[in-house]
Amino acid sequence: MKEAGMSMNAPARHKRGGLYFEGFEVGKLHEHTLTRTVTQMDNMLFSNMTLNPQPLHIDREFCAKETEWGQPLMNSLFTLGLMIGISVTDLTVGTTIANLGMVDTKFPHPLFENDTVHCTTEIIGKRESKSRPNAGIVELHHRAYNQDNKLVAECRRQAFILKQPKA
């Protein structure tokens, strides 16, 4: 997250670093500094772990001869997981109770081997939990870009987040 040093008014954080519900500011855009260059080994491992034999992800010869891309595409669910994972250190490590769902998930441009992913998260909503007084629901809009700033993935996600413990 690109923020100048911590101020006296910085929101309280969990000992592991995540923001409590009260620290999420609707409208704030977090630009995550953590990046990741993806590899074909990432693609192979993920595809094998998820039992996905799609040649579009794992077969260079097939992709070179039979696709418009000419090379394997990174598995879109790997891309989705990476995008959300990159946000965790800055925002939710130690404070997420559960993911409640994702909507409007899109992959407008393919991600390829050796692309470097960087991400942003915009806080687009939050509300108190009706059933749990120690938590709230935060809505996040995650976006992932490649090294050329082409949008490769986005989704809106609702997360169940802990409130700051009472002293």
Protein language model features and the residues they cover:
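Hot-dog-fold acyl-thioester-processing enzymes
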Residues: K2-L100, K163-A167
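HotDog/MaoC-like acyl-thioester-processing domains
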Residues: K2-V26, F107-T116, T120-A167
